[in-house]
C-alpha cells in the first residue's frame, strides 16, 4: 500500500471504502460514462454518430440527481471521506466528475454542497492536479499525435503501443 494508505485501517471504514469504490465503478460509470459522456463526446467525436439527446436529458434530470443525492449523504463536510487523506473512495468518485467536466457538467453546489466540496477537494489534490495538467494538454490533440505529445511532456508511457489509426469497438453494447 502507498503511504498514506488508500484503504482505511478500520475494518468497517475499509468495507465502506470498498463499497463506495464499487458504487463509483458500477453505478456512476453507467450514469456518467455510458449515459452521459459517451452520448455527448464519444459517439460524435470517435464514431461519427449522433448522441442520444433524450438519454442525456433523462440522465441529467433523473439519474445524475439520484447519484448526487446518495453522495450528499456520504460526503464529508471537510477533508476526505475517511479523514484527512485520500482514500480509494475519494479517488473513484471524483474521477467521474473530472470526466463529466470535459462536457461542461458541474455539480450544483447550492443543491449538493457537501458533494461539490468533497469532489472539489479531491480534484485539487496533488495526484489529480498532476494528471489534470497532462490531460488538459492532450485533450484537443489528435489521437495519432497524443503519444508524442505525452512523451514530450515527460509523461510515463509504455515502450510500445498497440494503438491503430482507426478506433475499434469493444464488446460492450453502447
What kind of feature is each model-predicted range?
Residues 59-63, 110-124:
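Extended, well-ordered alpha-helical scaffold segments
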Residues 81-106, 111, 121-122:
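GST superfamily/GST-like fold recognition
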Residues 3, 73-85, 126-131:
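Surface-exposed helix-capping loop/turn segments at secondary-structure junctions
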Residues 17, 71, 90, 122-125:
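Residue-level signal for nonpolar/aromatic packing positions in well-ordered secondary structure
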Residues 6, 54-61, 80, 103-109:
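Active-site rim elements
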Residues 1-58, 159-174:
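GST-like domain detector, emphasizing the conserved glutathione-binding G-site
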Residues 135-174:
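Acidic/histidine-enriched, glycine/proline-rich intrinsically disordered or flexible terminal extensions
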Residues 55-74:
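Amphipathic alpha-helical packing segments from all-alpha helical-bundle domains
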